[in-house]
Amino acid sequence: MTTTKNNGHKKLNVPNKREQNQTCLDSAEREGLRPKGNVPNLRFPEFQGEWEELGLSELLDFKNGLNPKPNKFGKGIKFISVMDILNNAVITYDCIKASVDVTEKELADFSVEKGDILFQRSSETLEDVGRANVYIDDKTAVFGGFVIRGKKKGEYDPQYFNYLLRSPFARKRIIPMGAGAQHFNIGQEGLSKVKLHFANIEEQKKIGKMLSLLDERMATQNKIIDKLQSLIKGIAQHCIRELINGWEYVRLGDICKITTGKLDANAQVENGQYPFFTCAERPFNIDSYAFDTEALLISGNGANLGYINYYKGKFNAYQRTYVLDHFSVNIQYVKWALKVLLPQRIAIEKSSSNTPYIVLSTLADLKIPIPNNSKQNHIADLMMSFERKLSTQLALSDLYNKQKQYLLRQMFI
């Protein structure tokens, strides 16, 4: 999408990054710089020659999964479900959640072995139909009825095949095979019609190894983020609970102004100029602002009930998002006090009145300990330093993900 920008009295059409990349590729192809034929844009230099187009049925034998009775679950051999396909970079025996008791015949008919590919049969959205994953463990598992197994019969590198099936090129060929139903489904016949391009086995191994190493680094990064978030939560709880005895408690409504936004949740604009805070964790965009202040934004309902954002500047807000501003104490200290104390208050009100949203009195009457200014500033500075560290780690995780998506676009055809 091209963005129009004002430059004095002239309007300049500035192409976005995707358009710029495509322009570069088109230009390179015209000048003979882009590889021609069945080869990817990005390739290890030691490999040459075109890739071979093969049907999935030339490499895999397809079969629908097992539908055990409910009393068979909870013991026995590991049982691969759709969630195991979606929630893991690769499937190993230990990462499979469910177990099932099967007969010897069922084990023979529905076994999953190293190198087999598992496909999601049904999805509520067309974009997710036919999602796939590879089983890379030496231990035998079985698979469920909402899964299609591709039993390995041809030569391929399992890791390469896994990443190929996640590439935009493969998704464009698989998705149409699941169209045309209320719940989008793909069957063995549809998968058998899909044709994809395969490198020679040595090139497959190198591509699969490189991308698997990137996935390992991304998994490590996620662990770093999880540990850091846990540390931050623990330190915040320690700091606030340390203040419970010996300091004055005040009503939140007495140290700030509490209002809400006025807009519907669907008021966002794709390329709007200002942040638009709803009950989602991240703000959307909008073309108009109703607030120009330093504030805490608290989600008043939905899945992220009680989620707290901080913002300083011009913004707008959803009618069920609470806007807290004009603080008489350190706003950053209050933010962390609320992160500790508000979930407890919400849990109490949910259990007593089953209220799935925050009412004004929930916030206004919430009492929080207020230490002296020096203590407030110390806690605020400490927690902000951890937030900066977390932001750095989250940005690095986002960078790894963008790098992976780029490689999936450029290293496959």
Regions inferred by a protein language model and the residue ranges of each:
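Short glycine/proline-enriched turns and hinge-like loops at secondary-structure junctions
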Residues: 72-73, 91-93, 270, 288-291
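A short beta-sheet element
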Residues: 81-83, 96-166, 278-343, 349-363
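Amphipathic alpha-helical coiled-coil/heptad-repeat segments
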Residues: 1-55, 198-251, 367-413
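A short glycine-rich beta-alpha junction/loop motif
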Residues: 36, 67-70, 140-146, 178-202, ...
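Non-catalytic DNA-recognition/assembly elements of restriction-modification systems
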Residues: 41-66, 193, 242-263, 267-278
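Short beta-strand/loop turn elements enriched in aromatics
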Residues: 73-91
